[in-house]
From Swiss-Prot:
Family recorded in the similarity comment: Belongs to the complex I 20 kDa subunit family.
Predominant location: membrane
Superkingdom as given in the UniProt entry: Bacteria
The organism of origin for this protein: Chromobacterium violaceum (strain ATCC 12472 / DSM 30191 / JCM 1249 / CCUG 213 / NBRC 12614 / NCIMB 9131 / NCTC 9757 / MK)
Primary gene name: nuoB2
Topological relation to the membrane, as annotated: Peripheral membrane protein
The protein, known as: NADH-quinone oxidoreductase subunit B 2
């Protein structure tokens, strides 16, 4: 049988990578790395009005159970090694969402000697959510953009990028 006749009969034709991407994007377990005032907006998004749980986004207390880290707030030079350690403890595939001007590029404290000018200097970031602080709706939109990115992302190409990463430790 050809694929158009199967689709007419109610069958869905997809690849295994597409199926896994769809399942994974619908069940993001996130670790909140709240460093400043943006973390308050992150709490608003998880509360009853917006209810992130209905999208399948479940908070985790340990990085070993999480596949998404939401970095919210000002990242200082002293906190950067701890954030990298937490990121390294997350299982593959892992994603990072940078929330707010301070996490994106240093924000108000950009010229301070103690601030990292963007968390993307420490960990690879998949989605940036702008604002100071960004609203809960902006965070939800950013998470939906990450879901769409996971659905269309080719897992094989992502693995190849990880293998070519300069920070990659040899096995």
């Amino acid at each position: 049988m050809d694929s158009p006749s199967l689709e007419k009969d109610g069958f869905l034709l997809t690849t295994l990578d597409g199926l896994f991407g769809r399942a994974q994007s619908g069940s993001l377990w996130y670790l909140s790395f709240g460093l400043a005032c943006c973390a308050v907006e992150m709490m608003h998004a998880a509360a009853a009005r917006y209810d992130m749980d209905r999208f399948g986004w479940i908070p985790r207390a340990t990085p070993r159970q999480a596949d998404l880290m939401i970095v919210a707030g000002t990242l200082t030079n002293k906190m950067a090694p701890a954030m990298r350690k937490v990121y390294d403890q997350m299982s593959e595939p892992r994603y990072v969402l940078s929330m707010g001007s301070c996490a994106n590029g240093g924000g108000y404290y950009h010229y301070s000697y103690a601030v990292v000018r963007g968390c993307d200097r420490i960990v690879p970031v998949d989605v940036y959510v702008p604002g100071c602080p960004p609203t809960a709706e902006a965070l939800l939109y950013g998470l939906m953009q990450l879901q769409a990115k996971i659905r269309r992302d080719d897992t094989a190409s992502r693995r190849e990028l990880l293998d070519r990463s300069p920070n990659r430790q040899p096995n």
